[in-house]
Amino acid sequence: IYSHDSYNAPDYTNSIKWNRKLEYKEVFEYYKALIRLRKGSPLFRMNTKEDVNAHLHFMHNDDWNCVSWKLEKDGECYVIALNPYYENRGFGLPEGSFYLRLDESGKMNKQPVSGSFVCPPLSAVVYKRIKNI
């Protein structure tokens, strides 16, 4: 039963349905990967407007309905892209080599990529710049 404002609803409505963890395992694993990503970099934990303004930069896209941005600080750089379309869309990358840190299924791919990448339909991806050693 769904309730828009369930603060005073019975436990049945507000209880955690633990069996759904198995039913929606892909979603559970994706959320775990998002939490791991957030914990892994202070760039995903900025909590002031000044920090966000200093380290977030929107990137140019030929398609105005697609959006991508760069988070960069102290040599660490991430590119995040959102594709709202039902087909693949291409995005550009800043200078350097990147790897796919998080795809639409929560997976990572350490294969280096540079110049551009393709974002799958109806998804978000996160790329991380490979640090030069």
PLM feature spans:
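Short, glycine-/Ser/Thr-/acidic-enriched flexible segments
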Residues: 74, 84-87, 105, 124, ...
